[in-house]
């Protein structure tokens, strides 16, 4: 029997949900909504007011992913307001960030980077900061410099592999698994050195992250901190973001070179047109090498043929 479950979330959480459900968005317009998406049998309708309605047999389960962000039952501290120690920016820290989750073409890249306190000023002097403030050429150039200076672990999930594992994960679970693995591998490399903290650029409430980590073989659960816009709090996250972004851009360039035409980032109408071109050339088998097939862009591209 279908069920309805309604929660009310903050503007920040609504923005986060918009990103998380981007691959599952439906091509339909409903008045006063931010988006309508479908995950399995559950339809999610997010309204501009901050109300989010989950409909379907698994509605309550899907809504539970956002437990701790809802302001409906009682006032809770937003996970986005996590406070860090006053001098955290001067600690020796592992920072992690990911790129590509909302892009139809290209991989998902996740990087964990370790910045010892002795390297903080050096990286800042080189211009290591929020990657959104940098041009693509600057990001690629800085990435090469950063990788020569600090320990890091970079995971690249290319579209073909992504399409193989995606049915077994939701968007949040996949990101948790990748962040956890990148951090774990970096900790193994650093041993016996231990960071004073591990800062994850927050994409889901902390309790949700820890819930999914329990499914992983190698679980990193100590010294974890979660904040949105983590690059503003420690240069380690900025470094991880730059390395992740550069890897994503380089993989997009490889895809473009292989296909003989430019492959865009994002998930807009241009992606539909390029996908249709690839479908004409080699069908879904070829497209699976370059795009995340569960995005709505695939169906839109098929309609263009």
Swiss-Prot record:
Q: Which cofactor does it need?
A: Mn(2+); Mg(2+)
State the function annotated in the UniProt record: Endonuclease that specifically degrades the RNA of RNA-DNA hybrids.
Question: What is one term from the GO cellular component aspect held by the record?
Answer: ribonuclease H2 complex
* Gene Ontology BP, a term: mismatch repair
Taxonomically, the superkingdom here is: Bacteria
Q: Which HAMAP family match?
A: RNase_HIII (MF_00053)
For this chain's record, the cofactor binding note is: Manganese or magnesium. Binds 1 divalent metal ion per monomer in the absence of substrate. May bind a second metal ion after substrate binding.
UniProt keywords, alphabetically: Cytoplasm, Endonuclease, Hydrolase, Magnesium, Metal-binding, Nuclease
Task: Give the species.
Answer: Enterococcus faecalis (strain ATCC 700802 / V583)
Residues binding a divalent metal cation, per UniProt: 97-98, 201
Cite the InterPro entries for this sequence: RNase_HII/HIII, RNase_HII/HIII_dom, RNase_HIII, RNase_HIII_N, RNaseH-like_sf, RNaseH_sf, TBP_dom_sf
Q: Which Pfam families match?
A: DUF3378, RNase_HII
Q: Which residues form a coiled coil?
A: none
- Extract one GO molecular function annotation from the record: RNA binding
Q: Could you tell me which residue ranges the RNase H type-2 domain spans?
A: 91-305
Family as reported in the entry's similarity comment: Belongs to the RNase HII family. RnhC subfamily.
Uppermost EC category? hydrolase
* Enzyme Commission number(s) of this protein: 3.1.26.4
- Protein name per Swiss-Prot or TrEMBL: Ribonuclease HIII
């Amino acid at each position: 029997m279908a069920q309805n479950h309604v929660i009310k979330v903050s503007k920040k959480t609504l923005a986060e949900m918009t990103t998380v459900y981007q691959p599952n968005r439906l091509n339909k317009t409903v008045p006063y909504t931010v988006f309508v998406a479908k995950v399995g049998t559950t339809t999610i309708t997010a309204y501009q007011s901050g109300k989010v309605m989950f409909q379907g047999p698994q509605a309550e389960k899907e809504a539970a992913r956002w437990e701790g962000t809802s302001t409906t039952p009682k006032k809770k501290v937003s996970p986005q307001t996590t406070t860090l120690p006053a001098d955290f920016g001067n600690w020796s820290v592992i920072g992690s960030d990911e790129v590509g989750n909302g892009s139809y073409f290209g991989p998902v890249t996740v990087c964990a980077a370790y910045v010892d306190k002795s390297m903080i000023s050096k990286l800042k002097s080189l211009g290591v900061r929020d990657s959104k403030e940098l041009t693509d050429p600057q990001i690629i150039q800085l990435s090469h410099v950063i990788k020569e200076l600090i320990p890091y672990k970079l995971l690249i999930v290319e579209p073909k592999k992504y399409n193989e594992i995606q049915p077994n994960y939701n968007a949040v679970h996949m990101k948790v698994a990748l962040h956890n693995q990148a951090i774990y591998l970096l900790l193994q490399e650093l041993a016996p050195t231990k960071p004073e903290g591990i800062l994850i650029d927050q994409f889901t409430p902390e309790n949700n992250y820890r819930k999914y980590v329990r499914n992983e073989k190698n679980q990193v659960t100590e010294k974890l901190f979660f904040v949105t816009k983590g690059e503003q709090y420690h240069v380690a996250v900025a470094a991880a973001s730059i390395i992740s972004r550069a890897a994503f851009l380089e993989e997009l360039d490889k895809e473009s070179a292989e296909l003989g035409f430019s492959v865009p980032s994002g998930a807009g109408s241009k992606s539909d047109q390029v996908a249709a071109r690839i479908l004409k050339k080699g069908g879904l088998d070829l497209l699976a090498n370059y795009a995340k097939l569960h995005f709505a862009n695939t169906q839109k591209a098929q309609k263009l043929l």
